[in-house]
Amino acid sequence: MKVSKLMEFNREQIEKNFRERIKGLSSVFGPSGFEEEVAELIKQNLADSDFTHSTDVLGNLIYHRKGTGDKKILIAAHMDEIGLIIRHIDSKGFIWVDTLGGFAPQQFFGKRVIIKTDEGKHINGIINSLHLGRPDRCTTMPSSVHEFFIEVGCESRQEVLELGIEEGNAVSIDYPVIELGKYKLGGKALDDRALVFILEEVVRLLQGREDIPDLYAVFTTQEEVGARGAIVAATNIKPDIAIALDMSLATDIPGVPESEYINVLGKGTSIKVMDKLSTCIGGLIAHPQLVRDLKKVAKDNQIPYGIEAYAAGATDASFMQTLNGGIIAGGVQIPMRYVHSYEVVDVRDVVDTVELLYRYILTQA
């Protein structure tokens, strides 16, 4: 990699890189707790990086570069995707599952899935659809994932076991990456693999630079089930500042009043001010100075951005903020439609987010 300079940010090249790498990042298998293949792909993508890298006991992949600045900054993007885990294989060879992360039952019907065995083999399967022979089941929505099963073409439990499939194996729902018009792409696990790309790209842009802070780029595990990887990483690293990279709900779609928009697709990056798990429990109120600093960088460099002031859910930053006596924490995101299903992003928002993070880091040296 060549040493980059601040004024040489090339939007066209970043967009090209995203279109080339997101297909691999999206398709790779990585439900919560089973992120090894994602980590291996990231290491391939960053094979030429001059950052050192290591892996901790929870599987977080940590890239580190000690610049000339005194501030220790942790930027996190989670590797895991929502998925399923096998809880039972019945006598007829049907596979019953539970969730890894936040699924709604209506997202399961008729989906293609990939099961990964302990030996690393990928096996195709299909989730059942509505029962056309039972009209009552065509008008009611299943209330639980326990009403769904996976078909792998076997006729007995023993036949399933002979494929290498066992209880405890993880399952990924498969959506191929597709291009939608000029700027949009749809795919699986863009939450958070689009942000994994962004963090990879920031590491690549900082190749050879000394005028950066003490920077940790952390590809975290198990965010979708409680930010477990980020908690461990931040506890061990003890950063002064922690920024979580994640999606922001793009709700600019039919049926949603404009007053309820959280973010808008194609209008720039997103700076988080607040999120929450419930009315008064959990979530994040981003540190005001960090929000001001990010907004200033965006304005100074004419980077379009939106503000996320409210949303259900939480990110890695929500859990890192109160560690080690308190961390300056916040979030930078990309707007995303149809989260936790066939997710859609805009490549312009991705490029804006890369630029915001890159330029922000260079102000912190």
Regions found by a protein language model. Give the residues of each.
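N-terminal hydrophobic/helix-forming segments and targeting peptides
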Residues: 1-365
